[in-house]
């Protein structure tokens, strides 16, 4: 059946791509185009709309996007009681976060029921560049060098983006969009203090300063430092982040962008607790050796140019992005020697394990967009690109026996990934400009090599996949927009899997979506959608042979609803609500038909904000129903708390923001936020280096902040 679907969709895409006459195409609605025409200074500005599937993440981009999509804007980030990006993402239907610290430093993201430790099954980008340690071989976010002061908005695309943004995009794409460099120099100083109770305070200082030094050269510096303790014992935290960006307009049609970033993190990890210890005091820590540290230096250089017309090719535009990252991270944990006691938190550690990994990543992605001719009123907009990524990974694990100081090297591995991807899509708009059909194809080629320095063993793994996609958008009238899409997505075999595998295929999924957006006026927005993710060839470990194989299958299906409304007679009040239903089931193995671990069937989001003069009051909440922590869907928690039902929880947050004064380009504001307002106690399980026990979720915290812009 999957083979038939693949060929049918491929043939349909090929027919739609080549059969129609070549035409020019505009991706924006007339209203959006008129708005943009008032603000751009340079001809190249529109490259962000026509050359990129996601555009600029403006309201019209979202309204006319042929897939499920939501944008969290700057005001929501600033006034929504968000300690970190984690807090903001909790309010998006379909996203669940296992927050262990409240700092956002080690995000644990689940998108539409797809989850792996340290967000391994979520594609997160910053300005279109992957944030993963290694986009193919190590997709986790163990290092997350992004602060709230850097980001203007978050663009969450849950469908329809697989052709242009891959790999690891089965559940969708989260793009963190940086603040634009202002035309006039501006500086913002901010400081927040979060009180976690029992004398524990977490400080966060931030600086953002930038502007155009000349008519053609802009510079932006963003820096922040987070230090202190989060709300639990054994939680010392020290995070430093510095990012410098530059824009150089060579002329009105040529733009050069550069970015350099340095990120440092050192954290103690409180870890999970045994059930008895959790009941006694969820704030305590019984894992005194657990900690984490990491370093990364990231850089990017991009060039954008509007060439104009080349014969039959009209409005030709080039975007060429190059990026590199050199990273290291190390998790240090206490362990027991017996396999039946490895991760027990209620017993003193016998081993001190270190797991340093080094990553060197280089990537380059040129992308062209153009329109072609005009015949019969049909319009086309083409986008084609190629991306090459090289990854080199050093993987070490060592154990220090505490009783006698004996050190044992457990793993000494080296990996190389050489990836090449190519994609093409064609957005075809019919004469009345109401129906747009976008077929596309993506080709992924990955060569992975593994070398065991200790034994001399070498292993190779190759994957070759063609990934079709097709999206359809229909503007029924000024109020209603309908969409549907189908696409093939993949996640490459991870470096630790190819060691014990035998020429593994990539994990593949068919994604289907259909939905609608309704916007009768500027005060009301409704989005409703349904989806199906048919995930096959998931890589699983055969416990008998200890070999990884493409055995696993899961099916994720559900619906998502988002509402936003402001009363006609009280426009200062904005109310929002959301609901997500998820039916994620295992489709293979001994537990076929049971729920996928960690997935909640129901998610509810409620919130609102009210602005009166210079004061804004915001209230938000999220609810997740119960979940299971193992494939067998075990209800009763066992003695070591490695399995058992996870509780439902409803968490409320609030923030009051007030502008103290604003004049002559200066603004001074203050805020007070309470997270987990009613101090709801709940826990997670299976979090990375402390998988047994109850991982306590953040309790109530109070955050006071000051911000000065001049």
Model-predicted regions and their roles:
Residues 302-306, 311-336, 394, 475, ...:
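Membrane-embedded beta-barrel scaffold of Gram-negative outer-membrane proteins
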């Amino acid at each position: 059946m999957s083979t038939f679907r693949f060929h049918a969709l491929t043939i349909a895409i090929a027919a739609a791509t080549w059969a129609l006459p070549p035409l020019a195409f505009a991706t924006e609605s007339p209203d959006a185009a008129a708005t943009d025409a008032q603000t751009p200074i340079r001809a190249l500005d529109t490259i962000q709309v026509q050359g990129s599937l996601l555009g600029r993440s403006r309201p019209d981009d979202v309204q006319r996007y042929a897939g499920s999509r939501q944008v969290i804007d700057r005001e929501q980030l600033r006034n929504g009681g968000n300690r970190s990006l984690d807090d903001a993402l909790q309010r998006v239907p379909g996203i669940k976060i296992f927050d262990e610290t409240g700092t956002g430093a080690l995000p644990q993201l689940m998108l539409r029921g797809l989850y792996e430790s340290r967000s391994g099954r979520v594609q997160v980008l910053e300005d279109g560049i992957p944030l993963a340690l290694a986009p193919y071989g190590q997709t986790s976010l163990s290092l997350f060098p992004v602060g709230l002061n850097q980001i203007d908005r978050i663009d969450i695309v849950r469908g329809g983006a697989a052709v242009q943004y891959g790999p690891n995009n089965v559940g969708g794409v989260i793009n963190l969009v940086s603040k634009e460099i202002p035309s006039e120099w501006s500086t913002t100083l901010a400081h927040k203090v979060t009180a976690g109770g029992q004398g524990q305070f977490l400080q966060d200082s931030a600086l953002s300063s930038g502007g155009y030094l000349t008519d053609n050269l802009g510079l932006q510096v963003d820096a922040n430092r987070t230090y202190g303790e989060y709300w639990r014992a054994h939680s010392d935290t020290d995070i430093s982040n510095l990012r410098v960006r530059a824009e150089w307009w060579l002329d009105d049609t040529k733009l050069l962008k550069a970015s350099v970033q340095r990120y440092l993190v050192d954290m103690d990890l409180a870890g999970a607790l045994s059930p008895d210890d959790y009941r006694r005091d969820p704030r305590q820590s019984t894992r005194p050796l657990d900690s984490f540290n990491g370093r990364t230096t990231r850089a990017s250089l991009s060039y954008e140019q509007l060439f104009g017309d080349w014969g039959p090719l009209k409005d030709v535009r080039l975007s060429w992005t190059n990026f590199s990252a050199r990273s290291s991270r190390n998790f240090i944990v206490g362990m027991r020697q017996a396999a039946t006691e490895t991760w027990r938190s209620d017993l003193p550690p016998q081993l001190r394990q270190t797991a340093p990994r080094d990553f060197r990543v280089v990537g380059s992605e040129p992308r062209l967009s153009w329109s072609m001719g005009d015949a019969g009123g049909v319009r086309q907009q083409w986008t084609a690109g190629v991306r090459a990524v090289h990854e080199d990974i050093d993987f070490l694990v060592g154990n220090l026996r505490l009783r006698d100081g004996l050190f044992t090297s457990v793993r000494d591995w080296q990996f190389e990934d050489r990836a090449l991807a190519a994609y093409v899509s064609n957005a075809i708009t019919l004469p009345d400009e109401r129906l747009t059909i976008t077929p596309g194809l993506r080709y992924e080629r990955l060569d992975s090599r593994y070398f065991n320095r200790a034994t001399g063993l070498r292993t190779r793994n190759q994957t070759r996949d063609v990934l079709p996609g097709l999206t359809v958008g229909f503007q029924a009238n000024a109020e209603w927009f309908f969409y549907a899409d189908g696409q093939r997505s993949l996640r490459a075999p991870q470096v630790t899997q190819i060691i014990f595998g035998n020429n593994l295929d990539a994990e593949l999924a068919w994604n289907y979506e259909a939905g609608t957006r309704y916007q009768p006026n500027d005060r009301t927005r409704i989005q409703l959608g349904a989806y199906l993710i048919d995930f096959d060839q998931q890589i699983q470990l055969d416990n008998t042979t200890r070999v990884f194989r493409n055995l696993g299958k899961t099916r994720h299906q559900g619906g998502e609803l988002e509402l936003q409304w402001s009363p006609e007679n009280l426009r200062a009040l904005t109310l929002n609500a959301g609901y997500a239903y998820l039916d994620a089931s295992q489709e293979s193995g001994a537990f076929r038909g049971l729920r996928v671990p960690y997935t909640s069937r129901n998610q509810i989001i409620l919130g609102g904000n009210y602005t009166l003069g210079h004061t804004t009051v915001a209230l938000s909440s999220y609810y997740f129903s119960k979940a299971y922590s193992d494939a067998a869907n075990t209800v009763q928690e066992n003695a070591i708390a490695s399995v058992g039902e996870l509780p439902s929880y409803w968490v409320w947050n609030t923030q009051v923001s007030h502008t103290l004064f604003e004049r002559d380009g200066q603004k001074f504001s203050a805020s007070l936020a309470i997270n987990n307002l009613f101090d709801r106690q709940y826990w997670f399980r299976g979090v990375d280096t402390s998988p047994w026990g109850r991982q306590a979720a953040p309790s109530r915290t109070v955050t006071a902040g000051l911000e000065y812009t001049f």
